Amino acid sequence: MQPRNDTSLFKGNCFDILPTLPSSSVQLFLCDLPYGVLNKQNPHAAWDKPVNLNALWKEMKRIGTPNCAYVFFASGLFTHDVIESNRKDFKYTLVWDKKATTGFLNAKKQPLRRHEDIVVFYAKQCKYHPQFTKGTPSHIRGANATGKGNHNYGNYNPEITMKYTDDKYPTSILCFEKNKHVLKHPTEKPVSILEWLVNTYTDDGDTVCDPTMGSGSCGEACLNLNRKFVGIEMDEIWYDYAVNRLEYRTEETKSNGSTKLSGEENGN
């Protein structure tokens, strides 16, 4: 799939950058904000400061299209905070099963942890493309061990029910293995789950915005799927890393089309 020629990266605070973006220009906000749950005494966790969600919603609602989807990674109390920040538009949560456990130091006090939440909002029905998976064929309604049908659910047409395939609709549990390699960013998400979300809530050529992009994983997912990407990062080290990462990914896809990677600095 040929990549679009619109990948825009901005260095600066998202509250300085977002007001400069045009209204009704984004179809999906895919947010992996700081959860604000790490040890405040740890100097390496200084970046984990809560974002002003009310101020963020004000800008996102202006920039998003009427049927824009707003998707947040979250966990623990931060999940509650995210939902409470916009109860009106909250629709549902997904559970990301990371297939990797943490919390061994507290294993005798509480269950090991292997999931994070994904919180979905929209004001008007957003685009939704179910990502089907293969499974065993569905049980045909009315069949029983004797081979004779039953009428527990009323009459039905066997010719119609026999048309069911082994394609399965997605559930609220998403199983994507957490990256096992040395993480580029301390809260980096697998490109695979980001691609799943981008495919689910956008069309080819739509625009996705990540207001705190970190190492640029969301941008890579968008490049892979022919989506336009707007990424914002205030940390200079991670911004530079994301630029280099996406430029490298762009070079890999040049044989399939031209990709333009633009970067801007806010001066903060």
Task: Tell me what each language-model feature is.
Residues M1-I232, I237-Y239, N268:
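Core catalytic lobe of class I
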